[in-house]
Amino acid sequence: MSSKLRVGVAGPVGSGKTALVETLCLSMNKNYEIAVVTNDIYTKEDANFLINKKVLEEGRIIGVETGGCPHTAIREDCSLNKNAVLDLENKYNPLDFVFVESGGDNLASSFSPELVDLSIYVIDVSAGDKIPRKGGPGITRSDLLLINKIDLADKVGADLNIMKSDTEFMRKGKPWFFTNLSSGMGVEEIIQFLESHIPNNRN
């Protein structure tokens, strides 16, 4: 028996991927059975962070040391992550959600459909308002795009109106949200998006 929904979380270093996973676990774990797989190149830093924050019981969080390029471990050769997901699904059957957090990567990052059912891509305004129009699979093809840290827009000179216009053009109708995960802005909308994708049955 597999989990109902495997959700990939990708994005550049520092965009807010771990903050998103932390927030979703804390917000959803009373109503859903959840587990997490994190990716780091040489450490298990993100997994340890989530464990120390007590977002879930420790056994539900697995850290994968990819030892190389982050996108290889979620796309070309996702065996390490797939095995971690299967371990969690076997141990905590049934699971509603398994979140797979990629290591920080560039705009070319994308998940193998063998690993996840849907993907969330996280960028943030501190990288500049030009990021959405640069495109890439995360911007254009992810199931949900988040533009995080909008509270920093004025401080870094990012124009949210430009980001909105460019994002709507690049996404072609696919969903996206402005978020400020540190304050909780956008979290309810993300949860509703995830809940809307839970299948009735998945073998």
From Swiss-Prot:
GO terms for biological process: urea catabolic process. GO terms for molecular function: GTP binding; GTPase activity; nickel cation binding. It is found in: Cytoplasm. The keyword ATP-binding does not apply. GO terms for cellular component: cytoplasm. Gene3D superfamilies: P-loop containing nucleotide triphosphate hydrolases (3.40.50.300). Pfam families: cobW. Keywords: Chaperone, Cytoplasm, GTP-binding, Nickel insertion, Nucleotide-binding. InterPro entries: CobW/HypB/UreG_nucleotide-bd, P-loop_NTPase, UreG. Disulfide bonds: none annotated. GTP binds at G11, P12, V13, G14, S15, G16, K17, T18. Homodimer. UreD, UreF and UreG form a complex that acts as a GTP-hydrolysis-dependent molecular chaperone, activating the urease apoprotein by helping to assemble the nickel containing metallocenter of UreC. The UreE protein probably delivers the nickel. Belongs to the SIMIBI class G3E GTPase family. UreG subfamily. Facilitates the functional incorporation of the urease nickel metallocenter. This process requires GTP hydrolysis, probably effectuated by UreG. This is Urease accessory protein UreG. The lineage of its organism: Bacteria, Bacillati, Cyanobacteriota, Cyanophyceae, Synechococcales.
